[in-house]
Swiss-Prot record:
Signal sequence interval, chain numbering: none
Mutagenesis or variant effect for E408Q: Abolished ATPase activity, leading to impaired activity of the m-AAA protease complex, preventing cleavage and degradation of substrate proteins
Stated name of the protein: Mitochondrial inner membrane m-AAA protease component AFG3L2
Effect annotated for changing F377S: In OPA12; uncertain significance
PTM entry text: Upon import into the mitochondrion, the N-terminal transit peptide is cleaved to generate an intermediate form which undergoes autocatalytic proteolytic processing to generate the proteolytically active mature form.
Gene: AFG3L2
Outcome recorded upon mutating L299A: Reduced rate of protein degradation
Residues annotated as the enzyme's active site: E575
GO molecular function, one term: ATP hydrolysis activity
Phenotypic consequence of M666R: In SCA28; abolished ability to degrade substrate proteins
UniProt effect for mutating W779R: Impaired ability to degrade substrates without affecting the ATPase activity
Mutation effect (T430I): In OPA12; uncertain significance
Organism taxonomic ancestry: Eukaryota, Metazoa, Chordata, Craniata, Vertebrata
Outcome (variant: E691K): In SCA28; impaired function shown in a yeast complementation assay
Length: 797
């Protein structure tokens, strides 16, 4: 009985059939039949259960397949509205809400039913769906691990191929003479039908331990040559060397795939880190797929600049503080029915603090601050600009209330209808989208827009109208009080000499730097620190600041530039002519220092202290022209010739003459009219006046310059001795200050102001007015309260 069961066991899946054969009459003895019947019933029951289980699996798979909607008809079964599975138990319909996530996970994982996303919209988490939407489903960490493991794999492959024992190559003749004829060959292995590896008889391996191999042209030729050779050597029967054919991987397949892998890796890296996606984290994968996304940065508590670090533009600062106060305390304005202005545009010359004021706004506002440059909207692809504008304002609405700052908005906000030559301009499309987003049907709420530009004259009028930019804030160069306040800000971190007081030093430096912008003031303070460090000084003294001012005004001092004695003498008399002419002209600027040491592009240098004023008379402009012509006149008087050194002087005189006649209406023949002079770099296609008027203007300019030149000749001819004394002392000392001029020429015959107190006399106070209106005195109070509140109360509010 046992051996029969064992035979049946060996038949595998034929147990039932074998038992049936044994149960027929005569198959087994009568005593064995009851046991076999019991075994038969057990086996058939198990087989039937196995068949039922297989049938159940097939039916379940079929139901899962049929539960999915046909391809292309997914939209007709949104969100599982095609009903539940028929095979789903009723208890699932009555499950509590807490068990729904698990049921959803099971249905989506198994692909059944219409309750999951498979019955409707495609799962957004699927990697291919994310890839099509421009979002690679691997973050930077996964990418780094992927490249690391790939590099390790290919490095291991290369290491294996380099260190793999390559054996020793021999020729057919060496194989015959040294191995086959001596009977040390056990067998020959034909590898990949390319070469033959020789396997030696045990105990007869070469001393170096390397196997030997030789190349073959073709397998048929090798077999014929081997058979012929063995016959010649008398090797017959079982003594003949067996030939084995094997296939091995020598790494050539992997090496052939390496270029493909490198190309794929490069494409993935390019897609993820394309030109439009560099530095963009968390918003798509960058590159070509996200070229329409905005490149704006959202700043939250990342700026260290505060309003206390901004000086010299108090009026503009108050305007911006009001925006911040509205976002922090809107009830103060809403109770009166006021609406927050949509935006403000900051205009003014370069370096006056427009971007710095925006940074201070970002540092003080307790709301998100979004910054973007106007040039970032325009790319080489058509339609990118409007798409980025839409994405930018969508980002702003998402973070509302917030402040949006567009720097250099003139790059995208230029007037429409210029320079397109009949073609559609991408810049115009971007501007149109910007206008719609700022004040159209899709207006923003609680989003304040700030913008900065140096050229408000070229902006489109539709961009500047109320409702888009309600306020235009002009930030001009600071006056003497503003410069003193700016100096106080930039003197804080500097290590000054113990004899210097910051307030007095700031006022003195402000009086020495008329016309300086905030950026120039910051540059002066930094240059003074660099000069002190260059001389290994322990602190910064007043002399360092004076040298820094000269460095900013005149440029780098070139002590190593060698001038010929004749050239040096010409430069000395040229600068002496400027100094003496200005000394004896009432409306000329007071002289501070004159030098014949080359600075910047010039061979000489004169520093004046111009009076800060906003209105100029005709006599004042004429005196300035005469002082500027003093160098050329001095050359002609003392040398009887003129040089090219007066080129810059003549340019300034010509500009002043044209401005008086064309812009200011200071000529009787041309009349009381004003035309705009073209800016440097502007394209002038036609003049706004006739040819006859242009000829008249040119004639009057020439007459005005000639009159100024004759007046200067008469003045310096009268003061010829003074010019010579100043020139000789310049040749001796190279640098003269105001005290030297007083010693040579006596006190200046006209009253002049030189100290800070004299300049601010009659203006009300010595310092800039930094007081706040009543409504803005507690503008930062809400933020301080939030800081004092414990975390639990803050969350509760």
């Amino acid at each position: 009985m046992a051996h029969r069961c064992l035979r049946l066991w060996g038949r595998g899946g034929c147990w039932p059939r074998g038992l049936q054969q044994l149960l027929v009459p005569g198959g087994v003895g009568p005593g064995e039949q009851p046991c076999l019947r019991t075994l038969y019933r057990f086996v058939t029951t198990q087989a039937r259960a196995s068949r039922n289980s297989l049938l159940t699996d097939i039916i379940a798979a079929y139901q899962r397949f049929c539960s999915r909607p046909p391809k292309g008809f997914e939209k007709y079964f949104p969100n599982g509205k095609n009903g539940k599975k028929a095979s789903e138990p009723k208890e699932v319909m009555g499950e509590k809400k807490e068990s729904k996530p698990a049921a959803t996970t099971r249905s989506s994982g198994g692909g059944g039913g219409g309750g999951g996303k498979r019955g409707g919209k495609k799962d957004d988490s699927h990697w291919w769906s994310r890839f099509q939407k421009g979002d690679i489903p691997w973050d930077d960490k996964d990418f780094r691990m992927f490249f690391l493991w790939t590099a390790l794999f290919w490095g291991g492959v290369m290491f294996y191929l380099l260190l793999k024992r390559s054996g020793r190559e021999i020729t057919w003749k060496d194989f015959v003479n040294n191995y086959l004829s001596k009977g040390v060959v056990d067998r020959l292995e034909v590898v990949n039908k390319r070469f033959v590896r020789v396997t030696f008889t045990p105990g007869k391996t070469p001393v170096d331990g390397q196997y030997v191999w030789f190349n073959i042209g073709s397998v048929d030729t090798f077999e014929r040559n081997l058979e012929t050779l063995q016959q010649e050597l008398g090797i017959e029967g079982e003594n003949r060397v067996p030939v084995v054919y094997i296939a091995e991987s020598d790494g050539s397949f992997l090496l052939s795939m390496l270029p493909t892998v490198l190309i794929i890796a490069f494409l993935l890296y390019t897609i993820r880190r394309g030109p439009a996606g560099i530095g963009r984290t968390g918003r798509g994968m960058g590159g070509l797929f996200s070229v329409g996304e905005t490149t704006a940065k959202v700043l939250k508590d990342e700026i260290d600049v505060k309003f206390k670090d901004v000086a010299g533009c108090e009026e503009a600062k108050l305007e911006i503080m009001e925006f911040v106060n509205f976002l922090k305390n809107p009830k103060q304005y809403q109770d009166l029915g006021a609406k927050i202005p949509k935006g403000a545009i900051l205009t003014g010359p370069p370096g006056t603090g427009k971007t710095l004021l925006a940074k201070a706004t970002a540092g003080e506002a307790n709301v998100p601050f979004i910054t973007v440059s106007g040039s970032e909207f325009l790319e080489m692809f058509v339609g990118v600009g409007p798409a980025r504008v839409r994405d930018l304002f969508a980002l702003a609405r998402k973070n509302a209330p917030c402040i949006l700052f567009i720097d250099e908005i003139d790059a995208v906000g230029r007037k429409r209808g210029r320079g397109n030559f009949g073609g559609q301009s991408e810049q115009e499309n971007t501007l149109n989208q910007l206008l719609v987003e700022m004040d159209g049907f899709n207006t923003t709420t609680n989003v304040v827009i700030l913008a900065g530009t140096n050229r408000p004259d070229i902006l489109d009028p539709a961009l500047l109208r109320p409702g888009r930019f309600d306020r235009q804030i002009f930030i001009g160069p600071p006056d003497i009080k503003g410069r003193a306040s700016i100096f106080k800000v930039h003197l804080r971190p500097l290590k000054l000499d113990s004899t210097l007081e910051k307030d007095k030093l700031a006022r003195k430096l402000a009086s020495l730097t008329p016309g300086f912008s905030g950026a120039d003031v910051a540059n002066v303070c930094n240059e003074a620190a660099l000069i002190a460090a260059r001389h290994l000084s322990d602190s910064i003294n007043q002399k360092h600041f004076e040298q820094a001012i000269e460095r900013v005004i005149g440029g780098l001092e070139k002590k190593t530039q060698v001038l010929q004695p004749e050239e040096k003498k010409t430069v000395a008399y040229h600068e002496a002519g400027h100094a003496v002419a200005g000394w004896y002209l009432e409306h000329a600027d007071p002289l501070l220092k004159v030098s014949i040491i080359p600075r910047g592009k010039g061979l000489g240098y004169a520093q004046y202290l111009p009076k800060e004023q906003y209105l100029y008379t005709k006599e004042q402009l004429l005196d300035r022209m005469c002082m500027t012509l003093g160098g050329r006149v001095s050359e002609e008087i003392f040398f009887g010739r003129i040089t090219t050194g007066a080129q810059d002087d003549l340019r300034k005189v010509t500009q002043s003459a044209y401005a008086q006649i064309v812009q200011f209406g200071m000529n009787e023949k041309v009349g009381q009219i004003s035309f705009d002079l073209p800016r440097q770099g502007d394209m002038v296609l036609e003049k706004p006046y006739s040819e006859a008027t242009a000829r008249l203007i040119d004639d009057e300019v020439r007459i005005l310059i000639n009159d100024a030149y004759k007046r200067t000749v008469a003045l310096l001819t009268e003061k010829k001795a003074d010019v010579e004394k100043v020139a000789l002392l310049l040749l001796e000392k190279e640098v003269l200050d105001k005290n030297d001029m007083v010693e040579l020429l006596g006190p200046r015959p006209f009253a002049e102001k030189s100290t800070y107190e004299e300049f601010v006399e009659g203006t009300g106070s010595l310092d800039e007015d930094t007081s706040l209106p009543e409504g803005l005195k507690d503008w930062n109070k809400e933020r301080e309260k939030e800081k004092e509140e414990p975390p639990g109360e803050k969350v509760a509010n």
